Amino acid sequence: MQYRKIGETGAEVSLLSYGTGGPSHFGQKTGLDDSGRAALVNRAIDLGVNLFDTAEEYGESEGMLGRALKGHPRDTYLIATKWSYRRPNGMTTDPKTAIRSIEQSLKLLQTDYVDIFQIHGVRPEHYDLLSEIFIPVLQQLKQQGKTRFLGVTEMLSTDPKHYGMSLCMERHPDVWDSVMLKYGIMNQWAAKHALPLAVSTTTAVLNMAPVRLTLTRPEKLSERMNEWGEKAGSKALDWLSDGNSSKLISKGYQFAAEPKEITTVISGTSSIAHLEANIDALNNNLPTNDLLRLKSEYGDSASYD
């Protein structure tokens, strides 16, 4: 397992980290029980994974993760969780919601602190008000030792060009230790501005869902390629994978981890076999010719899925 640094914090994170969101929601949607989750986490740690990402919005995943990590020394892994300011009728303006959220997260995760406390799904049009209201309380939580670092995550479905994350880094580079965005074969837009900005502000980049959902579902890939004028549809990337779906996913992870600006690539699965395959993929680099062709053909891509 390779490790990269979280900005200027000095903390090191595994190149592949584990996410409890995604389609399976840490096995909540696939019938995995607590013993299965513990086995998954144990295997991840055995293979060198040291960052586990969760959120208050991921069903019961925080409590499940807390139980799965029990018995592992707290200083051997990192936990990132998220709090959402968004509400059905807009956004909350009560700073106490962030305090209540982290207190509940700490209880469920059975820990005294999290390593990264993130604002979940920041929309660029909300950022000015959001930062004015919530940055002071988040900094207070950091000073109190309830979180080591502060981060923000994007709302990819409405912001595939990462304006929100770029705005966060531009406005408050001294506040945010990390941003979470998507960079992959089907969404390379971050390379134009967000990734260079992360370098200049020494901000860690957590790469979420780099192969989901397009590379894992031929019908989605066909739909997206048809939109982009690729007549080959779902076979447009057969040159990369020899038509093998598992190989395409591995290539997708390799592409996602290639930029040095990327700190870690988050993988969410309820399958130990899939986890092992994703980690194994990152033990190899994508061939230079493949990398250059993907950047040449899809460098302007900004797919929300």
What role is predicted for each listed range?
Residues L106-E125, L129:
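Active-site groove signature of glycoside hydrolases
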Residues M1-Y77, V137, Q143:
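N-terminal binding-site loop/beta-alpha segment at the start of enzyme catalytic domains
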Residues G31-A44, T93-L109, T158-M169, L248-Y253:
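Short, acidic/polar
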Residues G22-S35, W83-I99, G121-D128, S157-K161, ...:
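Active-site mouth loops of central-metabolism enzymes
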Residues D75-N89, I119, L181:
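A short, structured active-site edge motif that brings together acidic residues
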Residues A11-L16, G48-N50, P73-Y77, T111-D115, ...:
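Short, well-ordered coil/turn segments that N-cap beta-strands
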Residues Y3, V122-D305:
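Beta/alpha (TIM)-barrel catalytic core signal, keyed to glycine-rich beta->alpha loops juxtaposed to Asp/Glu
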